[in-house]
């Protein structure tokens, strides 16, 4: 691990991005101090985050999301040097120092480039020409650029992302460290004196690649302008010991410009760090940015450091109350990348050796270096940020106990706890929390809630795909357990409620439907008469009936039980929430009754997400909608089956519930009556026709008898009468009416 760390450190110090971005600084810095309050605002290079370094087309194609420009509020505290804000992200495969040195003073002030992020925070500081002269004075040789370009074009394997051979050892680490030190301290030569190089080099020569958190004495509050090196020198002092987390095994990791994480693993975590110590408000307005702006409070009793959230796979930001050691509680291993960083998955105990503390005379001679105690420790591709602040030493035990408790509760994995120092408990506020002290709240413009809540999200790169999960870890402090639980429940209801509701519905697929499943289970409702106030609510009726529909056909061996739990603020207002257990052997699939305000906009308290390893509980409204949809589909299915049964008389509908739609005796009787009445009418008409025909036939027969008698009397012969009957000419007028009637 030591060899690979040294190779990475050497590669970090020799990136060609450093050289080109430094030369870009010289051109863009002003030649004379600007006037008014708008000084320090300069346009940035359009290709500040994806400048070319050889063949970087692959890295340029990684930026797919538009850039987001973040600005501080104008009414906030006075801002310090824009060099405090020099940690942004470079190309997707570049290490942390490239982002530190590449994005310079003017590239942070205002964003005009495609992927650059600007800040309008330096409104009261003039940038003199001496800074540009210091930048030009500290140009490094072009041989380092050629070394890195050759390493890029040599086509190393992804397993060895350093690009250097085994021959380069800690000697090159020390050399590059010295170069970075001279370069970093030159940028603030006029404002603060550099720390001796022996002290700075000792920061990176520890065998554990760890840094010392030095606690200087509290200075006089004379620093309105502060030191511009507060975020430059420390990270560059840590330069060679940084084990190049950006050059991970997966070089195709897309670094999202809208998030701007400083570390690029396959999945990187970003954390809102909330350091609050002294009367100084550490103010970072960007969740994904590694920019820190040291703010001077209205009563500047002390100037403390602002933290830069260098996000690795698992970052930790700790506000140190004094000189102490970062234990392994917050040390991380990249568990989320077993395929790329398997060699680094050992718990690293960052043991920090103590450096000599500056005495009182040094404190007097270095009044502007009060904000330099910000050291970045990068171990195995992860970042740990420690911010020291002039507070009481007694808080050390408190933080150490919190770190140990964090390790016990939450094992070291993808998520980490970020404990905050002091007595500030604004971090534990939920989304409905309040801003207790505006000067001491570090809010994030990217986070959904700006009230001091810190979350940890995993960004999924293009190589990782969809195999990622978002975590939210909260540290309860000062007894704010209920608010933490409420925030955790909000996360559970927002991220996994839809999936869980679909899981509940999918469990109904292979189950047979009974009569009780298709109807409202009123008996289940009658058993709840112990709660008369709840029974009066229509929503409770519908939820109980829907719960019976959803939970009954799950497993024949699992029984559904109901039990009463604690009533909270108002016992008359209660809520039903369902928890579907994951284990079939467990006999309890319960419907928990919890008292909450009945307003639909309020937070519905849900059971703990990690409880019993079960499915996350459904929110009340979402569960109600899903159950209503299921019940509607079942009723439609019932009607379809009834219609099909009506078409085939042989099929029986006894398995279906008895309802007016199932029997339908009246429509059949009506149809038969109609048919009978029609038949009777037809029969009557036919009878009338028959009677009419009979009457006409009788008339015809009577006429024939009368004619025959006259013929007999006249002729006295029967032959004439016989011929007259069959002769149409003689009998035409006599037989014609009879013929028409018969037809």
Curated annotation (Swiss-Prot):
Ranges annotated as biased composition (Low complexity): 29-56
Coiled coil residues, start to end: 672-713
Keywords, ordered alphabetically: Coiled coil
Region ranges (Disordered): 1-125, 156-175
Keyword Coiled coil: yes
Biased composition (Polar residues): 81-102
Family: Belongs to the CCSER family.
Protein name: Serine-rich coiled-coil domain-containing protein 1
Species, as recorded: Bos taurus
Gene name of this polypeptide: CCSER1
